[in-house]
Swiss-Prot record:
GO molecular function terms listed in the Swiss-Prot or TrEMBL record: symporter activity
Compartments (UniProt record): Cell membrane
The protein's name in its UniProt record: Proton/sodium-glutamate symport protein
Oxidoreductase is among the record's keywords: no
Membrane topology: Multi-pass membrane protein
PROSITE patterns: NA_DICARBOXYL_SYMP_1, NA_DICARBOXYL_SYMP_2
GO biological process: dicarboxylic acid transport
Pfam families linked to this entry: SDF (PF00375)
Subunit-structure text: Homotrimer.
Main subcellular location of this protein, as a coarse class: membrane
InterPro entries membership: Na-dicarboxylate_symporter, Na-dicarboxylate_symporter_CS, Na:dicarbo_symporter_sf
TM ranges: 4-24, 44-64, 78-98, 149-169, 199-219, 223-243, 245-265, 307-327, 331-351, 352-372
Cytoplasmic side: 1-3, 65-77, 170-198, 244, 328-330, 373-421
Organism: Geobacillus stearothermophilus
Length: 421
């Protein structure tokens, strides 16, 4: 009998979670029994993310060993991220203006959700200016950054350490071998943890549906439909078009990442798939030096799905309150989002925090966020899947742009996937 693939196992877990959550809607015991299972799975993934990023980056950077090359890669990567996320904001604004998801919605029929925790987080984040964000990329204490899980300082330290390993030549070989062994061991651990993914997905979805139910979607169904349709458009038209420019088939990327996309969608967490997408992009022909730098950095600077949603949600709230947003005000919103949406990965409820930091500056009532907080998890699932595709594509594009993409390895990997399908 043929073994059921991981994608199908996760999908079955997703469906069963929805069924259990719907049957026991409003029953707090669902969270009591299932939340620990979901939390254990998320903790297992978070446990391995930092060791994989550090070991992969050190090995990748040490193999390049050239500060000038790395600086060139970093510059190109940031430019690419800025262009794509700006396009995502524009697409979100256009979708909100064309489909008007907030027009005609009766605010009295909507439930308000407490957003105080997001407000507190936003107040903390707003104390940091853009300059401070860049200053904080350089860690004053790497162990403090490791404890907090601050990805950008960890990436900076790993790059510098990798350059140091390369610079000392023969003396650095034992260190390099240690990190190579660490990376391989952690990828093995990742594969073992992924066997637990269907159970984690079942638990997390079961808890979500039991808390919010399907009824919470009905008053805001137009917003949900517009968000999902716009995300699909962005994947196949925008990212698909960019991929085609570089000779990449977007459907190949989706096929490669099918397991990870279902998992990221179900858990609404990009972190759960970071190790696997790095591994798969290497198998697809991207060098370790590029995947280990571009993908983790993209988690802070290239959240395409999140930035698209933030623009759309901002206009939705304005429409909800009957506020007319002229072009000049929408351009201001675009410029503010270009800044506020960068560099705060790892902050809980990052999209909400960005929106809270943005709405007030363009004259939109932040209280409106309380109306969509209840369905944020459903919307978060869609934007997470888009973030995963966007960052995976970025790694391939940077590899091609740098002339380091292994075309033959990529073709062999696709052929191998087609045979096993």
């Amino acid at each position: 009998m043929r073994k059921i693939g991981l994608a199908w196992q996760i999908f079955i877990g997703l469906i069963l979670g929805i069924i259990v959550g719907a049957i026991f809607y409003g029953n707090p015991k669902v969270a009591t029994y299932l939340q620990p299972i979901g939390d254990i799975f998320l903790r297992l993934i978070k446990m391995i993310v930092i060791p994989i990023v550090i070991s992969s980056l050190v090995v990748g950077v040490a193999s390049v060993g050239d500060l000038k090359k790395l600086g060139k890669l970093g510059g190109k990567t940031i430019i690419y991220f800025e262009i794509i996320t700006t396009i995502a904001i524009v697409v979100g604004l256009l979708a909100a203006n064309i489909f008007q998801p907030g027009t005609g919605v009766n605010m009295k029929s909507l439930e308000k959700t407490d957003i105080q925790s997001y407000v507190d987080t936003t107040n903390e984040v707003q104390h940091h200016s853009m300059v401070e964000t860049f200053v904080n990329i350089v860690p004053k204490n790497i162990f403090e950054s490791l404890t907090k899980g601050d990805m950008l300082p960890i990436i900076f330290f790993s790059v510098m350490f990798g350059l140091g390993v390369a610079a000392i030549g023969e003396k650095g070989k034992p260190v390099l071998q240690f990190f190579q062994g660490t990376a391989e061991a952690m990828f093995y651990v990742t594969n073992q943890i992924m066997k637990f993914a269907p159970f984690g997905v079942f638990a997390l979805i079961g808890v979500t549906v039991s808390k919010f139910g399907v009824e919470s979607l009905i008053p805001l169904s137009k917003l949900v439909i517009v968000v999902y349709a716009t995300m699909v458009f962005f994947i196949f038209v925008v990212l698909g078009g960019v991929a085609k420019l570089f000779g990449i088939n977007i459907f190949h990327i989706i096929k490669i990442l099918k397991d990870e996309l279902i998992l990221a969608y179900s858990t609404a967490s990009s972190e759960t798939v970071l190790p696997k997408i790095m591994e798969k992009m290497e198998n697809f022909g991207c060098p370790k030096a590029i995947t280990s730098f571009v993908i983790p950095t993209g988690y802070s600077f290239n959240l395409d799905g999140s930035t698209l949603y933030q623009a759309l949600a901002a206009i939705f709230i304005a429409q909800l309150y009957g506020i007319d947003m002229p072009i000049s005000q929408q351009i201001s919103l675009l410029l503010v989002l270009m800044v506020t949406s960068k560099g705060i990965a790892g902050v809980p409820g990052v999209s909400f925090v960005v929106l809270l930091a943005t709405l007030g500056t363009v004259g939109i009532p932040i209280e409106g966020l309380a109306f969509i907080a209840g369905i944020d998890r459903i919307l978060d699932m869609a934007r997470t899947a888009v973030n995963v595709i966007g960052n995976s594509l970025a790694a391939i594009i940077m590899s091609k742009w740098e002339g380091q993409y292994n075309e033959e390895k990529g073709k062999q990997y696709i052929a191998q996937l087609q045979q096993s399908a």
